[in-house]
Amino acid sequence: MVNSCCGSVCSDQGCGQDLCQETCCCPSCCQTTCCRTTCYRPSYSVSCCCRPQCCQSVCCQPTCCRPSCCVSSCCKPQCCQSVCCQPTCCHPSCCISSCCRPSCCVSSCCKPQCCQSVCCQPNCCRPSCSISSCCRPSCCESSCCRPCCCLRPVCGRVSCHTTCYRPACVISTCPRPVCCASSCC
């Protein structure tokens, strides 16, 4: 298997086998549509070889599926789902239907709870910040979320205050604003 990819005469026989070595890559094993000139397909984790996820018809580039999906010379397949691809975050949880949520990405790490339903917050990634399908940015303090911000100040009406209600201010599902003075309840 190894020898079939090596030598002065290259053959497609054995190309893509996991036994092929880096020095055995040859142009005859390549597909010109998406692979580099010195790689074979389907490939494995050999540096000079094409990654199979880079050779999808919907997102074919010289080096990998989509340029923004590339970290150094390695392609992350989870970046290239359906029609969405993120430049800084490559976790599948960042994709909802066909829409990527860049604001769900903190540095190089994705927080999936940012991408619930149709809401996504840049600063806060806790599920407790969500009421129905609406995120509440005012519920977020630094990296911590205060769920008590997201109560219903008027019974039957969904809203959120910039100040934080304390659980003690709540009767049933309706907080009592008069209970809250400054930051103390």
Swiss-Prot record:
Expressed in the hair follicles. GO terms for biological process: hair cycle. The keyword Lyase does not apply. Residues 14-164 are annotated as: 25 X 5 AA repeats of C-C-[IKRQVHEC]-[SPRT]-[STCVQPR]. Sequence repeats lie at residues 14-18, 19-23, 24-28, 39-43, 44-48, 49-53, 54-58, 59-63, 64-68, 69-73, 74-78, 79-83, 84-88, 89-93, 94-98, 99-103, 104-108, 109-113, 114-118, 119-123, 124-128, 134-138, 139-143, 144-148, 149-164. Keywords: Keratin, Repeat. One of its GO terms (cellular component) is keratin filament. In the hair cortex, hair keratin intermediate filaments are embedded in an interfilamentous matrix, consisting of hair keratin-associated proteins (KRTAP), which are essential for the formation of a rigid and resistant hair shaft through their extensive disulfide bond cross-linking with abundant cysteine residues of hair keratins. The matrix proteins include the high-sulfur and high-glycine-tyrosine keratins. PANTHER family: KERATIN ASSOCIATED PROTEIN, KERATIN-ASSOCIATED PROTEIN 4-11-RELATED. Belongs to the KRTAP type 4 family. Interacts with hair keratins. This is Keratin-associated protein 4-8. It comes from Homo sapiens.
